[in-house]
Amino acid sequence: MEYLLLLIGFVLLIKGADFFVEGSSSLAKILKVPSVIIGLTIVAMGTSAPEASVSINAALSGSNDIAISNVVGSNIFNGLVVVGICAFIAGFSTNRDILKRDMPVNIIITAILCFMFIDGRLSRIEGIILLAGMAAYITCMIISALKNREEAEDCKIMPLPKSLLYIAGGLIAVIFGGNLVVDKACIIAANFGVSQNFIGLTIVAIGTSLPELVTSIVATRKGDSGLALGNAIGSNIFNILFILGMSAAIQPLHVLSESLIDCIILLASGIVLFLFAFTKKTMSRWEGAACILMYVGYTAYLFR
């Protein structure tokens, strides 16, 4: 029964995020908000809504291990599995902006997070610093996009009542789904005698990363495999700056020594991914296979 409820929680998270993005994007268009701002804020937040709901709910309920391991585990999964599978299906060229801006930012903020973890806690002040970094990053992206006149793909406009219904329904589903996932993950961890940190790094992290995986595979099958790298790196930046920042700002988090090791592994995987993408400005199929094998090795390390 616990597994069924956990699955229902994941479904509510993913579908709720879809409804929230669709309703919010439609409302923003009704209010004449530029498409680029919609793409860089609402859609970005919606994609990471499952991770946000789980980590914030975990922080509020005192399950610090899940709040942190969910983000770290999701980021490792995004970088190695999501990008790895898409590169293995069809190698792709890497975008110049991602190489010069997003990937270095991802490495830098992950290194900063490792430094913050050293003292065994993520304080409220550190959470606010991460949130300020998120605001600065989004501002820079919006300015850059408007300067280069880049527009995100237009979303469909729904009637105002329907847009509001989608937003409200999506938020309720995401919040309820997040509560369900945290509660059932804790029970499953207790039943099997494993740590919440382990459950957060595996089952919860993979479950909340499913939207990124599905979106990227669909894009790859349509011939736009390069989108996978942008999705993964953008999601990872958002997860660290906004989700961990918000979680710590709400409730300071205790950090296990294992979480510091996992964060260092995340940093190493980010550097390897950057080197793969930087060489010849492409991600080849063998590099994708190498990423997948690295994740298999990491999973084996968790089961040690």
Annotate the PLM regions.
Residues 1-304:
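Hydrophobic alpha-helical segments, chiefly the membrane-spanning helices
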